[in-house]
Amino acid sequence: MKLKITTAQKIIITLLVLACSVAGFMLKLPVMFRHHDKEMHAAFYFVAAAFFTLLFAGKNFWIHGFIVAALATFGVVIEYAQEYSNSLMRHRIHGRFDPEDVKYTVMGLLAFSAIWVAYLLGAWLFQAQPKSSEADSDQ
């Protein structure tokens, strides 16, 4: 069964996910998760790249590249927003800008991109191979 999603539905889904992501990133992590912050950045952006690539790009390399660039930019903007939010509030609601978070954001994006490109190459290689029954029937 193939699920058909309209462009308007994709945009609504994207805006909802974006709003939840911003809200989630602007809150301070509970104590039990603070030592896993870097891994959570990598995992979140890995899943986000997979989600948006499946939603918008399919097998289009350029759209995937745009998605990865947009998510990387989002990651940097969120880090700056976290730092800025601390200066707006009377109490600290989040940590400081952390270049390590940006590093792990990029690592998560690159990890998904590597898997996605390997999948596309594998699909292309196996699709390009003629079936043995077709090759035998041509003779």
Predicted regions and their residues:
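Bulky hydrophobic segments
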Residues: 1-100, 106-139
